[in-house]
Structures are given as structure tokens and as C-alpha cells.
A protein has these predicted regions:
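Sec-dependent signal peptide recognition
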Residues: 3-10
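Enrichment for repetitive, rod-forming helical segments
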Residues: 10-11, 27
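Generic detector of low-complexity/intrinsically disordered segments
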Residues: 12-13, 231
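C-terminal motif of bacterial Sec signal peptides marking the signal peptidase cleavage site
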Residues: 15-18
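Compositionally biased intrinsically disordered regions enriched in Thr/Gly
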Residues: 22-302
Length: 302
């Protein structure tokens, strides 16, 4: 993956989280149901990926040059909804580049296109020709016709995959992007961003679709999040974000039990805190929800 594209995303990711309130054979795999947004649903996806047979994989290896390439394009079923998984792994003396995109292909084609365009907006991919674009880039590397002149050895990752499908109506996504130049950096630069989408419309779900518009209610949720962050950190001094509605960021997911907010390094506290997560139960959130909103309808009217 071109480093300029990755750098662009890393910059955009921090801005968004900080400011916004060949021939394909098919195989379907039914994964274990996820039981927790923050941890177990990620594990469920990992189990799903591990259990999918690599039925259309291409592996090229040249031991003399220490080059290795892997390409996988396969259909997979996650919580009853079909996705297509694209996996491209390139390892040479100059770079290590891993790309995995797990994208919706079930149901409404226009909705799927909206989701894909939103997820890959910072990567110059076209939803209508994404496979051709990925294969062209992979083939260029594999044939030795692609070079990033002047670069030292570097590593990059772009992983975009669903954490869970919720009630076959909504899908939560994680987008992980990282870059690392060992000769220049002590650790990788990375960003993890989370999204919720309506599978029927392709629209991204925002805070305004969930919470009551009153400032008092949103302030109360923000104060609760701050309290949970303090518990996570162990003391209030390590949380420099103020208690309030500003903590209701755009990086969140939900499931049948509640809602989880995710924060980037340095967003709410020092680097040593990592990426804090705050889970709020649906029972606690009920008084603050928009009564005609998505979550109130899903949690309390079904």
C-alpha cells in the first residue's frame, strides 16, 4: 500500500475521531456468535477468518530473493450475511505489505457501495472495480515491476473487517491502518477507527441517530464515560479529557447488550493508556436515547 495513502488516512483518522460527535470459488462459514463488542466479537471474526479455507489463493515464493506473495479472494458468511474477503500479503527485502478487506456483497447493491465507499474513502479505491485495483497492485509487486524509490525497508497494514452483524440490520466495522519504518521509528504509527452502518441503506450511523438532542442528556452520557475512563486509568490525573458531551465521539459500535466507545492514543489521556474502550449497557443508556431513534427501537421495541 502506497505510504502517502496510509499517511493520509492516519491524519484523517485522528481528525475524525477527535472532531466528530483470478476466478473465485465460494465457501461459506458460519462463525460463532459474538458475545461482546469490545473483545469477543473481534475474536469471533478472527476465528471466522482462520476457519475459511483459502480456496482461491495464489502463493509465489522465491527462496533466493526471500520473496513471498499470497493472494486470497473468497466469499464468507458472517452472522448470516455474505461478505467477500480480499487478502493480499507481500513480503520482500524492501517491504512487508498486508491488506485485508472484508466487504459486504449481500442484499442491496447500492447500500453495499455506500458502505465500501465510506470505509475506503481515504484510499482511492473504487467500489465498482476494487478487485481489479487490488489485483493490479499485487501483480505489479509480484512481477517486480513496482518500486518505491528511496524508501528503506518498511511495513504497512490495512485491515478492514466487520466485528459483528447485529440483527442482520446493522454491521460494525473496524479499520486498522499502520506504517512502520524500523530505520526511522521506535514503533509503528497506527490508527484504529470504528463504524456502524445500516445494511439496508448503507448509511453510517451517527450520534444524532441514537441520542436525545438535549444538551443535558448528552452531557450526562459524557460524564458517565469520563467516570469509566478514570476507572480504566486508575486515577483522574491520567485522564486529561474533560467530562462532557465531547466524549461522545464518532468511533463507536453497538450490539444487543450495549454500546462501546473507542478512543485513540492521546485522545483522552497519555500514550501509556493505549486505546481505551468504554462500554455502556443498554439499561443505563435507555433514559438518554432518542425515542424514535435506531437504538431505542432495536433494544426496547423489538
Amino acid at each position: 500500500m502506497n505510504k502517502k495513502i496510509i499517511y493520509g488516512f492516519l491524519l484523517v483518522a485522528f481528525a475524525v475521531v477527535g472532531c466528530k460527535s483470478g476466478e473465485n470459488k465460494e465457501v461459506t462459514v458460519e462463525p460463532e456468535q459474538s458475545v461482546s463488542v469490545a473483545k469477543d466479537s473481534v475474536v469471533a471474526v478472527e476465528k471466522t477468518e482462520a476457519s475459511v479455507e483459502l480456496v482461491d489463493s495464489t502463493k509465489l515464493a522465491d527462496n533466493a530473493d526471500k520473496k513471498s506473495y499470497e493472494k486470497v479472494i473468497v466469499d464468507t458468511l458472517i452472522d448470516g450475511v455474505k461478505f467477500k474477503r480480499y487478502y493480499f500479503d507481500i513480503r520482500t527485502d524492501e517491504l512487508a505489505d498486508e491488506t485485508m478487506l472484508v466487504l459486504p456483497v449481500d442484499g442491496n447493491a447500492d447500500a453495499n457501495k455506500k458502505i465500501i465507499d465510506r470505509l475506503l474513502d481515504d484510499y482511492s479505491f473504487d467500489a465498482d472495480s476494487i478487485q481489479q485495483q487490488l489485483e493490479a497492485q499485487f501483480d505489479a509487486y509480484a512481477s517486480g515491476n513496482f518500486a518505491e524509490e528511496g524508501d528503506d525497508y518498511h511495513e504497512s497494514e490495512l485491515l478492514v473487517y466487520p466485528l459483528a452483524v447485529v440483527d442482520k440490520k446493522y454491521v460494525s466495522y473496524m479499520l486498522h491502518s499502520s506504517l512502520f519504518w524500523p530505520s526511522e521509528q521506535n514503533h509503528p504509527q497506527w490508527a484504529d477507527v470504528y463504524f456502524m452502518f445500516d445494511l439496508n441503506t448503507g448509511e453510517i450511523i451517527l450520534q444524532d441517530d441514537i441520542f436525545d438532542a438535549s444538551a443535558e442528556n448528552r452531557q450526562a452520557v459524557g460524564v458517565k464515560i469520563h467516570d469509566e475512563l478514570v476507572k480504566f486509568a486508575g486515577n483522574e490525573e491520567d485522564i486529561f479529557a474533560e467530562a462532557g458531551a465531547e466524549l461522545l465521539n464518532a468511533s463507536f459500535v453497538f450490539d444487543d447488550k450495549g454500546m462501546t466507545f473507542f478512543y485513540q492514543p492521546y485522545e483522552v489521556g497519555p500514550y501509556m493508556l493505549g486505546e481505551p474502550e468504554v462500554h455502556l449497557s443498554k439499561e443505563w443508556l435507555e433514559p438518554y436515547l432518542k425515542k424514535d431513534g435506531i437504538l431505542y427501537d432495536y433494544w426496547f421495541k423489538n
